[in-house]
Amino acid sequence: NKANQATYERLQLLAKAVLTAGYSVIVDVTFLKKLQRARLRCLAAELSAPLVILDFQVAEAELRRRIQQRATEGIDISEANMTVLDYQLAEQQPLSEEERALALTVWPDTMPAEVTERLSERGYDRNQSRFDS
């Protein structure tokens, strides 16, 4: 839909501004569609910026449990509900082989320090908030 497309276009513009300023950027959005991911990959290539995809792997039952728990506790800060989850599960397109080569898979039991370590293995310097060239 148009609102969804506008969101991705805006995120791409913001990412470009941050990258052009010489910093790393995290674009935190679902990227369900290959086209959405391809546009960001093109931006990274255009700016000679490294790209890492954080591929969060959570079982569907666990996703449903989390949504239900947040709804029960009344602490949900997102628009996530079962309808949104059903849509996302139906619409998601798996990572291509090329995208998987760029991906770090993150499981529910993956500790943040492990993600940081794996990013540093790819050249990310958290003290500089950027990848080493």
PLM regions: where:
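Conserved nucleotide-sensing/catalytic segment adjacent to the nucleotide-binding pocket
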Residues: 1-43
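Amphipathic alpha-helical transducer elements in NTP-driven molecular machines
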Residues: 1-12, 37-38, 57-60, 64, ...
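Hydrophobic helix-cap positions at the C-terminus of alpha-helices
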Residues: 18, 43-47, 95, 122
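Short glycine-/polar-rich loops that comprise or flank the Walker A/P-loop
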Residues: 23, 47-52, 97-103
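Glycine-/small-residue-rich active-site loops that bind phosphorylated ligands and cofactors
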Residues: 32, 59, 111
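Short, hinge-like loop/turn segments at secondary-structure boundaries
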Residues: 44, 70-73
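Conserved phosphate-donor/acceptor-positioning beta-strand/loop module used by diverse small-molecule
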Residues: 46-67, 106
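Small-molecule kinase domains that catalyze NTP-dependent phosphoryl transfer to phosphate-bearing small molecules
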Residues: 72-118, 124-133
